[in-house]
Design a protein with these regions (language model features):
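Short, positively charged interaction helices/loops
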Residues: 46-84, 112-127
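Surface-exposed, Lys/Arg-rich phosphate-binding patches that contact polyanionic backbones
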Residues: 12-37, 60-62, 76-101, 124-125
Length: 127
């Protein structure tokens, strides 16, 4: 599968945000999700957000470089959606949206668009 690969660093607070977003996305799908799959789902949610400006503003506060390194893998088939999310975010900033900021926006969107209460996980009835 052809993909675009981005590698960047961020602060430990964003690492915690990513860990929780992955957990929430995994609970929602009932599968172990990767950081890339979680970010892509967040970008999808962001594109449909009622208030994308609020997500961008919140993400800008969290967009801090640091020592934690991540590799984000975007399949070429999803690159247009990824770019569309960055373009939407750019409407609310005075500069191009760097990949790290797009990543933080996506993680926040997972929280705002998936579960409000992530403690509930549907459990199938025993056979």
């Amino acid at each position: 599968m052809s993909q675009v690969i981005y590698t960047f660093t961020f602060d430990k607070s964003v690492f915690r945000l990513a860990s929780h977003a992955i957990r929430i996305h995994s609970h929602h799908t009932l599968a172990f999700e990767s950081v890339s799959a979680t970010a892509l789902k967040g970008m999808e949610i962001f594109l449909c957000a009622e208030d994308p400006k609020a997500l961008v503003e919140e993400a800008q506060e969290l967009d801090i470089p640091g020592d934690v390194r991540v590799t984000l893998r975007i399949p070429l088939s999803q690159k247009p959606m990824f770019q569309q999310a960055r373009d939407l975010a750019m409407r609310y900033t005075d500069h191009p949206v760097p990949i790290r900021l797009a990543f933080v926006i996506a993680l926040l969107a997972v929280f705002h668009g998936t579960f409000k209460d992530c403690s509930y996980v549907p459990i199938a009835e025993p056979d």
